[in-house]
């Protein structure tokens, strides 16, 4: 390496013979200066450039790893959210089906209750009609009996004397009282 450096120094002492030679002015441009500057840059800059590229590579790899981790986390969260969504949809379907079946059950219960109420009302109506018929029949019987008694009394009055008349009336009143007790019971 010393020989190379010495040779470059020797070049610097050569008298300039025109346009070719070693120029000590770093800003001057000629092929030798350019090759020396490039050689120095490559020799010393290779480590710095390598370190910069390695640092950049590490940052990129870290960013990629972080992105992969975030992506995996996002995929995991998405899967969890999809599982929760499926669960909620299943529960919603179950509630919907149960709700419809509950509505149908309530509807059937209401219809059955209405039929039961209608049957009870029909029974009450029939009982009321039967009771009213019995009452009317009893009233008709009483009127018929009263008219028959009045007719019999009229016939008896015309045919019987006072004593016989009183006995017949007493017997009829007793019989009428017995019938009246049976009717009112």
Swiss-Prot record:
InterPro entries, A to Z: ATP_synth_b/b'su_bac/chlpt
GO cellular component: chloroplast thylakoid membrane; proton-transporting ATP synthase complex
Main location as per UniProt: plastid
Membrane topology qualifier: Single-pass membrane protein
Transmembrane segments: 27-49
Location in the cell: Plastid, Chloroplast thylakoid membrane
CDD domains referenced in this protein's UniProt entry, alphabetically: ATP-synt_Fo_b
Highest rank taxon of the organism: Eukaryota
Pfam families (UniProt xref): ATP-synt_B
Alphabetic keyword roster: ATP synthesis, ATP-binding, CF(0), Chloroplast, Hydrogen ion transport, Ion transport, Membrane, Nucleotide-binding, Plastid, Thylakoid, Transmembrane, Transmembrane helix, Transport
The keyword Thylakoid belongs to this UniProt entry's keyword annotation: yes
Gene Ontology MF, one: proton-transporting ATP synthase activity, rotational mechanism
Function comment: F(1)F(0) ATP synthase produces ATP from ADP in the presence of a proton or sodium gradient. F-type ATPases consist of two structural domains, F(1) containing the extramembraneous catalytic core and F(0) containing the membrane proton channel, linked together by a central stalk and a peripheral stalk. During catalysis, ATP synthesis in the catalytic domain of F(1) is coupled via a rotary mechanism of the central stalk subunits to proton translocation.
Note: In plastids the F-type ATPase is also known as CF(1)CF(0).
UniProt family annotation: Belongs to the ATPase B chain family.
Subunit structure as annotated in this protein's UniProt entry: F-type ATPases have 2 components, F(1) - the catalytic core - and F(0) - the membrane proton channel. F(1) has five subunits: alpha(3), beta(3), gamma(1), delta(1), epsilon(1). F(0) has four main subunits: a(1), b(1), b'(1) and c(10-14). The alpha and beta chains form an alternating ring which encloses part of the gamma chain. F(1) is attached to F(0) by a central stalk formed by the gamma and epsilon chains, while a peripheral stalk is formed by the delta, b and b' chains.
Protein name per UniProt: ATP synthase subunit b, chloroplastic
Organism: Glycine max
């Amino acid at each position: 390496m010393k020989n190379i450096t010495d040779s470059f120094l020797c070049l610097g002492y050569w008298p300039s013979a025109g346009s070719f030679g070693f120029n000590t002015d770093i800003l001057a441009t000629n092929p030798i200066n350019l090759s020396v500057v490039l050689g120095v840059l490559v020799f010393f800059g290779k480590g710095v450039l390598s370190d910069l590229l390695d640092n950049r590579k590490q940052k990129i790899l870290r960013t990629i790893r972080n992105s992969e981790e975030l992506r995996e986390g996002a995929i995991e969260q998405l899967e969890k959210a999809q599982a929760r969504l499926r669960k909620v949809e299943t529960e919603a379907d179950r509630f919907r089906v149960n709700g419809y079946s509950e509505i149908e059950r309530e509807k059937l219960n209401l219809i059955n209750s209405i039929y039961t109420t209608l049957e009870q009302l029909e029974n009450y109506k029939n009982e009321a009609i039967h009771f009213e018929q019995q009452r009317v029949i009893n009233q008709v019987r009483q009127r018929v009996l009263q008219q028959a008694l009045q007719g019999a009394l009229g016939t008896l009055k015309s045919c019987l004397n006072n004593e016989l008349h009183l006995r017949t009336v007493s017997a009829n009143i007793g019989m009428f009282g017995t019938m009246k007790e049976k009717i009112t019971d």
